[in-house]
């Protein structure tokens, strides 16, 4: 970016600065080590053992797509990810801890390896690059309550302000998901723009809180 004199925005999940590995990244780590068939089988065992009343509701179909999202992925992988996204956060976190313990994966070490820290963020800021918010906990904003996403967005913005001495003005939706009630919160917190995961060029009449972007 510096060589071609291009402006870039780095969206920070602020909980990683506290050493936390977000759920989505735990899923990516698991899928990079193990087959999706093995993980789905383990998920079904987990539900049967800990949440038998939810086992049928969250059973993962490997033949029919749950949504039209993730068409670039095979059905099993897409449905595994989509199911975990809508799973209640406490149950999702418990399942992922269960997997990491079973497979002897060190979340703290992985977090240090894959994410930049405060020093690197400062360098990016010093070099004139934009520091945006990707929330604090990287929750899918259409799957949690307004009180939860309001607190999460405010915490992320406050953390970045404290770190960079500047309030973030650009926001990126985790998983590209939102509900309409998120937009007023972004305005209240001081964000000027927000980007989705829609990959296309910008139009003059695009909503400033629904800007497509390439990453």
What are these regions (language model features)?
Residues 15, 136, 199:
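Residues that form or immediately flank small-molecule/cofactor binding pockets and catalytic motifs
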């Amino acid at each position: 970016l510096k060589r071609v004199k291009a402006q870039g925005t780095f969206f920070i999940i602020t909980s990683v600065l506290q050493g936390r590995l977000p759920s989505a990244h735990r899923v990516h780590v698991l899928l990079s080590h193990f087959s999706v068939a093995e993980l789905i089988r383990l998920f079904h065992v987990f539900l049967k053992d800990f949440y038998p009343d939810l086992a049928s509701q969250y059973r993962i179909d490997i033949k029919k797509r749950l949504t039209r999202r993730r068409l670039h992925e095979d059905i099993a992988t897409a449905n595994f990810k989509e199911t975990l996204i809508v799973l209640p956060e406490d149950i999702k976190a418990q399942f992922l801890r269960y997997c990491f313990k079973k497979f002897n994966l060190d979340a703290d070490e992985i977090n240090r390896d894959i994410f930049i820290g405060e020093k690197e963020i400062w360098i990016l800021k010093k070099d004139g690059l934009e520091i945006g918010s990707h929330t604090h906990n990287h929750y899918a904003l259409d799957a949690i309550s307004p009180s939860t996403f309001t607190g999460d967005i405010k915490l992320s913005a406050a953390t970045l302000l404290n770190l960079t001495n500047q309030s973030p003005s650009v926001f990126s939706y985790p998983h590209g998901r939102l509900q309409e009630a998120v937009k007023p919160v972004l305005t209240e917190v001081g964000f000027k723009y927000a980007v989705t995961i829609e990959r296309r060029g910008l139009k003059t009449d695009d909503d400033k809180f629904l800007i497509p972007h390439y990453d």
